[in-house]
């Protein structure tokens, strides 16, 4: 049983690292106010600079004005132990990570049909400041698309996120 728990925790950390990387646009190991602003705005929110600064302060243990992975991991662990909004315990250790992945998937799946098309992927990448050619977007879809339908479903998305962390 302990071996299963360790594996789940390792998988969860890998999922959290991928979520962290989604925010950490320049890959320097910390989430700045500007990076947080970019992602939050891509989710359709319009926070003030003060609200963004407060979000960072809430988790910035070392007080340096950015969120490092350890601080992000601590935040995710606290969320998981609270069991989310339903008040449940933290026994379902994969639930928080699964919910994070589902939220990330929803960002890409603009029409909420359960599939990410090349056009949806292109739109999100542009809104995040990524400049990709049509060929690069299509290549990303081909690499993730296991069933060959030209789109990425949730299971393919999860697999892609897990592989990109290795």
Curated annotation (Swiss-Prot):
Positions where N6,N6,N6-trimethyllysine occurs in the chain: 131
Keyword field: Calcium, Metal-binding, Methylation, Repeat
Disulfide bonds: none
Gene Ontology CC terms: cytoplasm
PROSITE patterns reported in the protein's UniProt record: EF_HAND_1, EF_HAND_2
Binding positions (Ca(2+) 3): 109, 111, 113, 120
Single Gene Ontology MF annotation: calcium ion binding
Positions contributing to Ca(2+) 1 binding: 24, 26, 28, 30, 35
InterPro entries the record matches: CALM/Myosin/TropC-like, EF-hand-dom_pair, EF_Hand_1_Ca_BS, EF_hand_dom
Annotated residues for binding of Ca(2+) 4: 145, 147, 149, 151, 156
Domain EF-hand: residue ranges: 11-46, 47-82, 96-131, 132-166
Binding residues for Ca(2+) 2: 60, 62, 64, 66, 71
Pfam families cross-referenced by the UniProt entry: EF-hand_7 (PF13499)
Keyword check for Repeat: yes
Its biological purpose: Potential calcium sensor.
Protein family according to the UniProt entry: Belongs to the calmodulin family.
Name under which the protein is recorded: Calmodulin-like protein 5
Organism: Oryza sativa subsp. japonica
Gene: CML5
